Design a protein with these regions (language model features):
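A short hydrophobic beta-strand segment most commonly corresponding to one strand
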Residues: 68, 82-101
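Short acidic-glycine-tyrosine-enriched beta hairpin
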Residues: 55-72
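Structural motif
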Residues: 48-50, 74, 84
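Asparagine-centered strand-capping/turn motif at beta-strand->loop junctions
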Residues: 78-80
Length: 112
């Protein structure tokens, strides 16, 4: 459920916690998605990327940024055209399917 070159490593998935490490190469991003009844924390470890919640403006995120996405909020994130981004997510979830994938982020949405 990604567009472009994305490397995902699952670091922990036991109990109600999932920790994942992502490397998004330039121009890559995940799909619009949300986490049912679960908050997600995204930590930017390196590089530069984008983050957007449905109905909000796309914003630039950089190394050191921490983004907390409330439960059930549709969102996406990925790299900028000129930079990779490395990030880690921590999601506390109470159900098996921790993310509901919606649709690809269009080029028009990405380029806005």
């Amino acid at each position: 459920y990604n567009t472009g070159d994305v490397c995902v490593s699952l670091l922990k998935e036991s109990g109600n916690t999932m920790i994942a490490h992502f490397i998004f190469k330039p121009n890559s991003r995940n799909f619009w998605h949300y986490h049912p009844d679960a908050e997600q924390t995204l930590l930017v470890l390196d590089g530069e990327g984008y983050y957007q919640e449905e109905g909000g403006e796309k914003r630039v995120i950089r190394k050191g940024d921490v983004i907390v996405t409330p439960p059930n909020v549709r969102h996406w994130n990925g790299a900028t055209p000129g930079s990779s981004i490395v990030c880690m997510t921590v999601t506390e979830h109470a159900i098996e399917n921790h993310a509901v994938q919606l649709r690809a982020v269009t080029d028009k949405e990405y380029d806005r």
